[in-house]
Design a protein with these regions (language model features):
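Short, glycine-/small-residue-enriched flexible loop/hinge segments at domain edges that mediate gating
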Residues: 73-89
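Short beta-strand elements of ligand-binding domains
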Residues: 114-118
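A short helix->loop->beta-strand "cap" motif at the edges of active sites that frequently abuts
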Residues: 109-112
Length: 162
């Protein structure tokens, strides 16, 4: 992750921490939102595999590379990504990077659940990009971040069928 961050240290700084016992990849950003999501995930019985945050900026490539790096971890059972309403970051760029990495990794969202919850500039394009990957669940600001966390926990418990 450090190498990815060094690519352009002035554009979307990454903070990352792994949890050895976790099995749900977390790419929830926005500082406090990320911590809230991790706490909610644990309250609901999920096990976060990591903590992740990236500062505001146009960072499609960093999201792509970070998603690829996170997906390399063995034993993952699902992925949640998103954040609070973004005022500075185009969410379509974030979603494009994530979906590109998922597609290249050959992720089948029926077997490996993916839940995204984004809101902010570029939302319509983000929705279209997310819809291009079958069975990826995409939520907007009418769904709370806690609701999206609940959904990834449910999906990983269900054995990933939507």
């Amino acid at each position: 992750m450090r190498e990815i961050d060094r690519m352009d240290p002035h554009n979307g700084a990454i903070r990352f921490l792994e949890f050895p016992e976790g099995d749900i990849a977390c790419m929830v950003t926005s500082g406090g939102a990320a911590l809230t999501a991790l706490g909610q995930l644990m309250v609901l019985g999920g096990r976060p595999a990591n903590a992740f945050d990236i500062t505001a900026g146009p960072h499609e490539e960093k999201m792509y590379l970070a998603t690829r790096a996170i997906l390399e971890r063995p034993g993952l059972r699902g992925l949640i990504a998103g954040g609070n309403v973004k005022n500075f970051t185009r969410v379509d760029l974030q979603v494009r990077g994530i979906v590109r990495a998922l597609r290249e990794a050959g992720i089948d969202a029926r077997r490996f659940p993916v839940v995204l919850r984004f809101a902010g500039p570029g939302l319509e394009a983000a929705r279209d990009i997310a819809a291009s990957l079958p069975d990826l669940e995409f939520y907007e600001d009418d769904t709370s971040l806690e609701g999206a966390v609940r959904r990834i926990v449910e999906r990983t418990r269900e054995g990933a069928s939507p």
